[in-house]
């Protein structure tokens, strides 16, 4: 628990970090938040980059993984592989509502062609478990592998932002896909197995597909292009449902 939440001047901090590299941003986070620093992962296409980069600096950092219960088999195997290789301090969180129970109550929300259904799905399967993780782990700050090129919302981010009660820190914010590839190669790290199938981003099995001609963004391959964000990386307010609508996964 201990320790007070730092009161950061975000403009000053982001100006300072604008000259820093990704490792230096992680080191800054570790020094600024000696307690209550976590990271999140989706075990997605490029997740090995952040997992390796952060754990080289903070080996025992709690790594939060939201298991929706709908991930592809390959993702579960990839998670095991990376967890063992990097000796991750993995904290797995799931919705208290099982997939079968959710479908009985609400139907297959991902098949309902409206944002409200997708937002309900995301809240049940992703947002509520993440909020619980932040609370139970007494998180003050959260390292995430968001990059400016991924969604409209992410273009607006700084290296450090405030989301709800926590600070959010984005060490690879300005990295390009080429930077990611070069880091993976330099450290002999794996892509998710679906990369070889043409996927540039992967989430739940029912809402991800390979990149196709005509896609304007890699996030168009998720939720049939209707949403870009899942809600985990959008501001958490009392109007959660409405805020999820603003830029969704």
From Swiss-Prot:
HAMAP family: CysH (MF_00063). The keyword Cell wall biogenesis/degradation does not apply. Catalyzes the formation of sulfite from phosphoadenosine 5'-phosphosulfate (PAPS) using thioredoxin as an electron donor. It is found in: Cytoplasm. One of its GO terms (molecular function) is phosphoadenylyl-sulfate reductase (thioredoxin) activity. It comes from Picosynechococcus sp. (strain ATCC 27264 / PCC 7002 / PR-6) (Agmenellum quadruplicatum). NCBIfam families: cysH (TIGR00434), PAPS_reductase (TIGR02057), PRK02090.1 (NF002537). Keywords: Cytoplasm, Oxidoreductase. The gene is cysH. The active site is at 230 (nucleophile). It is an enzyme of class 1 (oxidoreductase). This is Phosphoadenosine 5'-phosphosulfate reductase. Pathway: Sulfur metabolism; hydrogen sulfide biosynthesis; sulfite from sulfate: step 3/3.
């Amino acid at each position: 628990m201990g320790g007070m939440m730092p009161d950061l001047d975000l403009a000053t901090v982001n100006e300072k970090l604008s000259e820093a590299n990704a490792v230096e941003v992680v080191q800054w986070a570790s020094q600024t938040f000696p307690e209550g620093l976590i990271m999140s992962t989706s075990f997605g296409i490029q997740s090995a980059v952040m997992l390796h980069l952060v754990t080289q600096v903070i080996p025992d950092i709690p790594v939060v993984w939201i298991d929706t219960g709908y991930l592809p088999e390959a993702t579960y195997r990839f998670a095991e592989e990376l967890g063992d290789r990097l000796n991750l301090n993995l904290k797995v969180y799931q919705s208290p509502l099982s997939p079968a129970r959710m479908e009985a109550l609400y139907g297959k929300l991902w098949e309902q062609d409206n944002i409200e259904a997708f937002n309900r799905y995301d809240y049940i399967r992703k947002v509520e478990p993440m909020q619980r993780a932040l609370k139970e782990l007494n998180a003050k700050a959260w390292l995430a592998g968001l990059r400016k090129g991924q969604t409209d919302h992410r273009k607006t981010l700084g290296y450090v932002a405030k989301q709800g009660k926590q600070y959010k820190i984005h060490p690879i914010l300005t990295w390009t896909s080429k930077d990611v590839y070069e880091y993976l190669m330099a450290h002999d790290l794996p892509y998710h197995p679906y990369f070889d199938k043409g996927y540039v981003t992967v989430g739940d099995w029912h809402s991800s597909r390979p990149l196709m001609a005509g896609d304007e963004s890699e996030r168009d391959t998720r939720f049939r292009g209707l949403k870009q964000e899942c809600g985990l990386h959008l501001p958490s307010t009392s109007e959660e449902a409405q805020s999820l609508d603003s830029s969704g996964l």
